[in-house]
């Protein structure tokens, strides 16, 4: 069944003022998909369902440069990354020479790579750290950015990853760089740029270094930046971010890629299990719940695979550990959302939403064609039994989480959004190309 969700008018009633009360830290959002890795907020979170430029905007802060990385949040601080072009422009710009390159932005200026810390209450910049300065070797796809990988934090240190331009450990209080790592220069497929975000568990930081040359997974000591282990792999570029889950009393690092999906032992890098079935362009990241993991791709072939991790060993392709799979309406850029046993995912990067029982793979309702949402690069998030989906054109649809989801609101902001939303307590944070927005109600403090 396909039906159309029609936009309706959200009338602005009042102009919101800056919030001078306390933004409660009901939860942190320490990585690009939150503390669960699934894009979900705790049940205590209850952000607004309606907003506009004149309604429920507590503050918005102008951002320098460009970045599609998601903000991460710890208590009263928000952290984000940005790439800032500067200096004289090269004329003509330097084109990408990657095989098969298309729709890429040629590089015309040097860039500074910044980390910015913003006060969650006021939106004021607390500190800004310049991590690196260089003339990028790739411009990347025209829809991307030079700062697309999201940082991750444990509250004491922030780990900001700029791919070929370095990994930086930064003191959250002062902005001081503690250590840095240079992994070399990536050669991404078609020169489309970099974007896999790091994952953190305990003292171990995981980096996906898949590209067109020698690919590898790095496990680093978060205190020193030194290798704990390195697993070399025969993989092409994948933009998928690692997911760390606990299964059979073992922490597994799960990474989706073209040749194989693999689960690595977090302690030593040993491959626990592997499975084929992904495409040549893997962008979406996995989600997991109750010992199951869900992985999707959509270009150049469509696939969505559900895997039971319990007892999985060796090559599990075509075994009973593959619970179900589909090649219909699978995700490309936005990752799936896994919320209370339901899998929400968008077709390619378009406004066609599938709602599926995660365990069985059976359609729960829909699919739904959302006419108002055209290009969607950000991944859906969920809070308080509602789903939030934001398009690049600045429109967010809020949908109820129930057996038959209903549209609750269509909210428009005058900015372009590729970064995924972050949720902290009763507040939603949207990072646009020009501004960072704090969305909340004055009554909820």
Whereabouts are the PLM-identified features?
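Noncatalytic, solvent-exposed loop/strand surfaces
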Residues: 21-445
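Cleavable N-terminal signal peptides
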Residues: 11-13, 19, 23
């Amino acid at each position: 069944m396909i039906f159309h969700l029609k936009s309706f008018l959200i009338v602005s009633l009042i102009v919101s003022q800056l919030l001078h009360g306390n933004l409660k830290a009901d939860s942190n959002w320490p990585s690009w998909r939150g503390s669960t890795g699934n894009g979900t907020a705790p049940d205590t979170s209850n952000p607004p369902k309606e907003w506009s430029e004149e309604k429920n905007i507590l503050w918005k802060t102008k951002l320098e440069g460009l970045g599609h990385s998601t903000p991460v949040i710890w208590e009263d601080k928000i952290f984000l990354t940005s790439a800032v072009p500067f200096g004289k422009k090269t004329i003509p710009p330097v084109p990408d020479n990657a095989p098969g390159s298309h729709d890429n932005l040629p590089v015309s200026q040097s860039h500074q790579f910044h980390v910015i810390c913003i006060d969650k209450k006021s939106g004021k910049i607390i500190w800004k750290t310049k991590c690196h300065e260089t003339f990028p070797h790739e411009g990347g796809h025209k829809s991307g950015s030079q700062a697309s990988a999201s940082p991750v934090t444990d509250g004491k240190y922030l780990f900001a990853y700029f791919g070929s331009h370095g990994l930086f450990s930064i003191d959250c209080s002062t902005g001081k760089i503690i250590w840095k790592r240079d992994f070399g220069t990536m050669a991404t497929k078609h020169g489309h740029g970099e974007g896999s975000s790091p994952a953190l568990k305990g003292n171990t930081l995981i980096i996906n270094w898949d590209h067109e040359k020698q690919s590898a997974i790095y496990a680093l000591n978060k205190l020193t930046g030194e290798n704990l282990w390195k697993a070399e792999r025969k993989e092409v570029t994948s933009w998928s971010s690692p997911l760390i889950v606990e299964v059979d009393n073992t922490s597994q690092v799960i990474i989706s890629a073209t040749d194989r999906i693999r689960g690595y032992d977090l302690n030593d890098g040993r491959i626990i299990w592997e499975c084929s079935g992904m495409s040549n362009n893997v962008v979406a990241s996995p989600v997991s719940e109750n010992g199951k993991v869900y992985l999707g791709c959509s270009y150049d072939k469509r696939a969505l695979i559900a895997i039971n991790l319990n007892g999985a060993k060796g090559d599990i392709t075509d075994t009973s550990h593959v619970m179900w799979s589909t090649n219909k309406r699978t995700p490309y850029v936005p990752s799936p959302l896994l919320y209370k046993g339901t899998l929400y995912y968008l077709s390619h990067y378009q406004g066609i939403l599938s709602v599926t029982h995660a365990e069985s793979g059976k359609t729960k309702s829909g699919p739904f064609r959302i006419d108002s949402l055209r290009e969607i690069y950000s991944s859906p998030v969920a809070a308080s039994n509602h789903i939030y989906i934001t398009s690049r054109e600045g429109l967010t649809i809020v949908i109820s989480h129930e057996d038959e989801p209903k549209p609750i609101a269509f909210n428009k902001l005058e900015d372009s959004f590729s970064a995924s939303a972050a949720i902290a307590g009763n507040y939603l944070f949207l990072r646009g190309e020009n501004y960072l927005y704090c969305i909340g109600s004055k009554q909820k403090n």
